[in-house]
A protein has these predicted regions:
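An amphipathic, aromatic/His-enriched active-site/gating alpha helix that lines ligand/cofactor pockets
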Residues: 24-36, 55-89
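Residues at the start of alpha-helices and the adjacent loop-to-helix junctions
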Residues: 17, 44-46, 70
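N-terminal first-folded block
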Residues: 2-36
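Non-catalytic surface loops within mature trypsin-like serine protease
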Residues: 10-12, 58, 92-95
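Short, well-ordered beta-strand segments in beta-rich or mixed alpha/beta enzyme
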Residues: 2-9, 39-66
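Glycine-rich beta-strand-turn "strand-cap" elements at beta-sheet edges
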Residues: 2, 39-46, 76-99
Length: 99
């Protein structure tokens, strides 16, 4: 299971535009093979920082989405709203012995 976290700092006056892009894309992302969950989180302060959190069956499923036509359409629109490059992490549960 891959837990994908993406941090996006959006232009303050474009937050509503970004939220609309996410809402229009959410169900299409969930329909992708291997996607179990996707949600948008907003920082309390400063409130122009957002995080997307998604769960993927495998890294291959995530990468297939990132290579998809849909991602190729949505990402440029999102990228145009950023104040700086997005940061992203693909993580998985660490089965450390102390857990």
């Amino acid at each position: 299971m891959i837990k994908r976290i993406v941090k996006l700092e959006i232009q303050a006056d474009k937050a509503a535009d970004f939220q609309n892009i996410f809402e229009e894309s959410k169900m299409k992302i969930l329909a992708r093979e291997g996607c179990f969950h996707v949600e948008l989180l907003r920082c309390v302060s400063p409130d122009n920082i957002f995080f997307t959190f998604s769960l993927w069956e495998t890294e291959d499923a995530l990468n297939a989405y990132r290579r998809s036509e849909m991602f190729g359409q949505v990402w440029p629109m999102t990228k145009a709203l950023l104040t700086k490059p997005a940061e992203a992490w693909s993580t998985q549960l660490d089965n450390a012995p102390w857990q």
